[in-house]
Amino acid sequence: AVWGDYGQNLEKKPVGIYGITREGELRLLFEFPAGAVRHVHGFAPRLAGGWYIFTGDMEEMAGIYIASGDFSIVEPLAVGDQRFRAVRGYDTPEGLVYATDSSIIKNHVYLLPDEDPSSLRVLSETNGPCIYGTSCDAGYLFSTTVEPDERVRGMCSYFSTSVGPGVQTRETQLLLVNRAAEVREVSRLKKDIYPMKLMQYGSIQFASGQERRSDVVCFCRSLKGFDAMPVEMEVK
């Protein structure tokens, strides 16, 4: 298992990546220097071996890195832009398929080739930021999240129902990217009426280990008629 530091990191401290050995020992595998990234969003295994690393949040700190299997080598692939702010991604023979997680601009599903990041390709627009996804028999699922407006501060932010600029509708959108990199919408579920910061963001989350399944198990949170409900859906 590998994971990275995630927090506000207002002091712009170094950000570590950690792993557990087979003997159960915790190790620091790599450390981004102070000010390089705010935190680590996630990882995706590469078909060629090693990892993609997703970091956030703002401009120069948002990026996608390539790491060797033991994290002895970590190099930037595409950094310094909200187009490279991601949490979930999946490697394919054509490149990395990922959805952006920006609360301040319109979000998209992209295809990013390793050999030529300048050939970044838009596969689809989404209605909001994406932090959840899973692979399944039909391809790759991404779900968007109904997030609050981060410009609302203090105690008022806990009761605000205003959404961020990157959230286009008050719905969680479920998108499928098939093996041919074609995108279609599977479903949309409406956010409930309650404030997001106090009562959770509207989201669809996924169980792990569904790579070969066509019936996908997910968990709905803060969605009208589906709050705190596990759901099984057929995805073809």
Give the location of each predicted region.
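Recognizes the extracellular SEMA beta-propeller fold with strongest preference
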Residues: 1-24, 29
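Entry beta-strands of beta-propeller and related beta-repeat scaffolds
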Residues: 1-3, 49-53, 94-97, 139-142, ...
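Structural motif
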Residues: 10-18, 59-66, 104-112, 149-175, ...
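Short loop/turn segments that connect beta-strands within beta-propeller blades
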Residues: 21-25, 68-71, 113-116, 179-181
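A short beta-strand motif characteristic of beta-propeller blades
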Residues: 27-33, 73-79, 119-123, 187
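Loop-centered beta-sheet repeat module
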Residues: 33-79
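Repeated scaffold domains used in trafficking and secretory/extracellular systems
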Residues: 36-42, 81-93, 124-139, 193-209
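Blade-level signature of beta-propeller repeat domains, shared across WD40, Kelch, NHL, RCC1
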Residues: 201-236
